[in-house]
Amino acid sequence: MKKEKIFIFICLVLLSACSSSLDGIVIEKAADGYKLSIDGRETYIKGVGGTYRLDIAAQSGANAFRTWGGNVEEIKKNLALASEHNMYVMQGIGMTKDSIRYYDDEYKNKMREEVRLLAETFKNDTSLLAWGIGNEIELGNANIAAAWNFVEELAQLIKSIDKRHLVSTVISYNPSALDSVAKYAPSLDYVGINVYGPMGEVQAVVDRSDYKGAFMITEWGPTGWWETASTEWKAPIEQTSEEKRQVYEERYT
């Protein structure tokens, strides 16, 4: 009887260990970079931005979409859409680009309360992939220690409540922002990078930076208006539809 109890106990311990290793979303170092697993299933994210025509996106092979912010009710709607279309959500948490606000206790306390509520409300939702703390905050004047220290604080806050989902931030194509993340926000699971014209240079830029973690392309497309040639009166010259088609194909591969 004693041996039987020991055997049952060992089985329970093993089952518990297996369950904990499979539950949740993790990023792990691999031979050729990083791999993402959802409940033990290796998953390659093929995402779109926003919630417009998710039916077509899903039919085309997309398995995730990204948002830039939202309150509890809006996020519930996003997650319901994700469930309906068998997709995952990278849910944004809006952050200011105004550097002064990162010295403002009123703003920071408001953000702490908001983030705590979101983490507690959605910590077990299986349609949620990740939290994205801020979008390109460095494009204002907030590529400063105070801002990134606060991103790190919020990341730690989320992780103390939500053990299932990943936590990230999204930056523009900006090597200095990568260095800031590496220095001030080590708790992030990955960095999202928004890039258009120099899509093929991203890996090299990451390799040259101080950041050594995982990254995900979170926005991409035709060359941005701020990257194209301009007329003599400084108006950007938009790519033609055919040029856009070509760069979509080139940059996707």
Over which residues does each language-model region extend?
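Extracellular glycoside hydrolase catalytic/binding regions
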Residues: N149-Y252
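Generic N-terminal leader/processing signal
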Residues: M1-K3, A64
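C-terminal motif of bacterial Sec signal peptides marking the signal peptidase cleavage site
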Residues: S16-A17
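Boundary at the C-terminal end of the N-terminal hydrophobic targeting segment
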Residues: S21-G24
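Active-site mouth of glycoside hydrolases
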Residues: E28-A31, K35-V191, E201
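Sec-dependent signal peptide recognition
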Residues: K3-F9
